């Protein structure tokens, strides 16, 4: 997993509350057994005027010119600014996969659905909770200024505006450690590889018949 320390990027304002995971990545795209290939269908029902299906050539589809991600000024955005209860609905981990593959590493909102919030950390993304009044202010600034950028500093736990204002956010120490060091569940396990090997050696001496059956 890619480590996260400080990110500076263009902000895309998604001015909608209660965006659920089916809107983030629709159910028809969940049939793949891979973790990749979802970014092209992020917010599919909103980005396109025709219905999408897995494996489709999106270059031939009808783009919705009114949807925020399709506007030229937000191309290359890597920070998503959203409204309350972002990521509600089903627990599909495909939602952060799609956001991440599209290019978003940071999502800022007044609140998140719990499972989506947890899944972001597991996939190298930083979900930041800021007061609704602050999000309102950032929304206005983003709409008013083309190319508006924010900086998310995980080490210091602050969001920094172009004019130098800083907004503090909370993050669990363990999750912060994992993001800063690029550790997913597998990475965390590998950190304990020596202890795991020691345990296996002890168990092989204590219960050798179990390991003989496994080898067979």
Swiss-Prot record:
Disulfide bonds: none annotated. It catalyses: (2R,3S)-3-isopropylmalate = (2S)-2-isopropylmalate. It comes from the Bacteria. GO terms for biological process: L-leucine biosynthetic process. GO terms for cellular component: 3-isopropylmalate dehydratase complex. Pathway: Amino-acid biosynthesis; L-leucine biosynthesis; L-leucine from 3-methyl-2-oxobutanoate: step 2/4. Its EC number is 4.2.1.33. Keywords: Amino-acid biosynthesis, Branched-chain amino acid biosynthesis, Leucine biosynthesis, Lyase. One of its GO terms (molecular function) is 3-isopropylmalate dehydratase activity. Gene3D superfamilies: Aconitase, domain 4. Heterodimer of LeuC and LeuD. Catalyzes the isomerization between 2-isopropylmalate and 3-isopropylmalate, via the formation of 2-isopropylmaleate. PANTHER family: 3-ISOPROPYLMALATE DEHYDRATASE SMALL SUBUNIT, 3-ISOPROPYLMALATE DEHYDRATASE SMALL SUBUNIT 2-RELATED-RELATED. NCBIfam families: leuD, PRK01641.1. Belongs to the LeuD family. LeuD type 1 subfamily. This is 3-isopropylmalate dehydratase small subunit. The lineage of its organism: Bacteria, Pseudomonadati, Pseudomonadota, Gammaproteobacteria, Moraxellales.
């Amino acid at each position: 997993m890619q480590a996260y320390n400080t990110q500076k990027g263009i902000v895309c304002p998604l001015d909608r509350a209660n965006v659920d995971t089916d809107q983030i990545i629709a159910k028809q795209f969940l049939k793949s057994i891979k973790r990749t290939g979802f970014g092209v269908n992020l917010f599919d029902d909103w980005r396109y005027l025709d219905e999408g299906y897995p494996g489709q050539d999106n270059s031939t589809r009808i783009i919705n010119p009114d949807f925020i991600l399709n506007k030229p000024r937000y191309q290359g955005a890597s920070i998503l600014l959203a409204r309350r209860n972002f990521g509600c609905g089903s627990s599909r981990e495909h939602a952060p996969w799609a956001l991440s593959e599209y290019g978003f590493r940071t999502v800022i909102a007044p609140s998140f659905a719990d499972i989506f919030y947890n899944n972001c950390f597991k996939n190298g993304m930083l979900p930041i909770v800021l007061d609704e009044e602050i999000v309102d202010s950032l929304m206005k600034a983003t709409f008013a200024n083309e190319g508006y950028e924010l900086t998310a500093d995980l080490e210091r736990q602050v969001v920094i505006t172009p004019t130098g204002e800083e907004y503090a956010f909370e993050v669990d120490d363990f999750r912060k450690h994992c993001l800063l060091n690029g550790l997913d569940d597998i990475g965390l396990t590998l950190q304990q590889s020596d202890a795991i090997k020691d345990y296996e050696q002890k168990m092989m001496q204590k219960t050798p018949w179990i390991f003989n059956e496994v080898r067979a």
